[in-house]
Design a protein with these regions (language model features):
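Conserved core of the sugar-phosphate nucleotidyltransferase
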Residues: 109-175
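N-terminal glycine-rich phosphate-binding loop and ensuing alpha1 helix
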Residues: 1-57
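Short glycine-rich anion-binding loops that position phosphate/pyrophosphate groups of nucleotides
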Residues: 11-14, 54-55, 80-81, 105-108, ...
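Short beta-strand segments
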Residues: 6-10, 50-51, 102-103, 131-133, ...
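Hydrophobic packing residues within well-ordered alpha-helices of enzyme cores
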Residues: 16, 40, 59-63, 118, ...
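Residue-level signal for inorganic ion chemistry
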Residues: 7, 33, 89, 103-104, ...
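Short beta-strand-to-loop acidic/aromatic patch adjacent to the donor-nucleotide binding site
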Residues: 96-107
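Conserved N-terminal catalytic core of the sugar/cofactor nucleotidyltransferase
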Residues: 33-98
C-alpha cells in the first residue's frame, strides 16, 4: 500500500504564548517541523506539508536546509480551519496515494513505530489513530459545572496524531 504523509504546520503558537509558529521553534537545535517530518521518511513514499500562506516560503527553506526536500513533495498553503488544511493536503497528494497519515507538525516526537502501526491499521481496517490511555481523572459536568459522572479511566483514550486512512475514505469524509 503506497503511503504518504500530510504534515500540518499552520499553527500560530498562541496557546503556548510563542511569538511565532511553534513548528519553527527549535528542539535541541532542530526545528520542530523537521523532527515531525523525519520519522515518516523511511515509511512513506513522500509528504505534503501544509503551511500558513504567509509561511510557505519559510517552510520550504527550512525543509531544504534540513535535507528533507526530496521527501517533501510539496509545501502548500492551508485553509482557515484544520479541516480546510487537511483538504488542501489531500488535494496535493499524488494520484498513486492509497494510504495517508495526517500528522500535526507540532508533534515533534512521533516515532517510526507509531507510524508503522498506523499504516498496519489502515491495511487491516481502513483507518487508525495514535492514542494513549488517559491517566487523569475525567469528570463529565452539567452546564452549571456540577459533576454528573466520573467515567471509567480504562475506557478512555487521548487521541493523538497521526490519523491514518485509506485515501478514498478520508476524501469521502471531506466531500
Amino acid at each position: 500500500m503506497k503511503s504518504y504523509a500530510i504534515i500540518l504546520g499552520g499553527g500560530s503558537g498562541r496557546r503556548m504564548e510563542a511569538d511565532r509558529n511553534k513548528v519553527f521553534l527549535p528542539l535541541r537545535g532542530i526545528p520542530a517541523i523537521v523532527r515531525a517530518i523525519a520519522p515518516f521518511s523511511g515509511l512513506c513514499a513522500g509528504a505534503v506539508v501544509v503551511a500558513a500562506a504567509a509561511e510557505v516560503e519559510e517552510m520550504r527553506g527550512i525543509i531544504a536546509r534540513c535535507g528533507l526536500d526530496r521527501f517533501v513533495l510539496r509545501v502548500v498553503p492551508g485553509g482557515a480551519e484544520r479541516q480546510d488544511s487537511v483538504r488542501c493536503g489531500l488535494d496535493a497528494l499524488p494520484a498513486d496515494a492509497e494510504c495517508v497519515l495526517i500528522h500535526d507538525g507540532a508533534r515533534a516526537l512521533v516515532t517510526e513505530d507509531v507510524i508503522r502501526r498506523a499504516i498496519e491499521s489502515v491495511e487491516a481496517r481502513g483507518s487508525g489513530i495514535a492514542s494513549v490511555p488517559v491517566s487523569d481523572t475525567i469528570k463529565r459536568a452539567a452546564p452549571d459545572g456540577r459533576v454528573l459522572e466520573t467515567p471509567e479511566r480504562a475506557a478512555l483514550y487521548a487521541m493523538q496524531t497521526p490519523q491514518a486512512f485509506r485515501v478514498e475514505l478520508i476524501r469521502q469524509a471531506h466531500d
